[in-house]
C-alpha cells in the first residue's frame, strides 16, 4: 500500500493534496463530509505518485468514475486547524472531465466514502449550480471560487489562512 504525503509532528501537520474541479451543465461536483463544508473532490498524493495519478485514483475510489485530468487551475498554500494542531497544506487543483458521463448521476446528490488514516469518512457528492457559488455557498478553500467563476485559462496561486 502506498503512503500518503501527510506528516504529523507534536506541533503541526503537513499535507500534500490534489483536488479536481468537475463542471458539467453549469454545475460543479463537490464532496461534503458529514458535519463539514463542501470541498473539491481529491485527496492526499501518495509517495512516488503524480498529482494526475492521484486524481484518477481518488475519483475511481470515491466515485467509481474514470476521469481525464485537464489543465492546472491553481496552486494553494492552505493553513487550517487539523484537530488541535495547525496544518500547512500544499494543494494543486486541476480541471477534470469524466471519460464516461454515465459513470455517475448527472444531477442531484449521491453517497460515497473515503478513508483517511484507516478511518472511513462518509461523503455526499452534490452537483451544485455555479450560481450558488456566486451567492456565497461555503466551499473549502473559498479562495479558489473566484478563479473557477472567472473561467480564465491561466494557473493562479492563492493563500488560504483559516488559522
Regions found by a protein language model. Give the residues of each.
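Short, well-ordered beta-strand micro-motif
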Residues: 22, 95-97, 127-129
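Short, charged/polar surface micro-motifs in flexible loops or helix N-caps
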Residues: 26-28, 35-37, 46, 75-78, ...
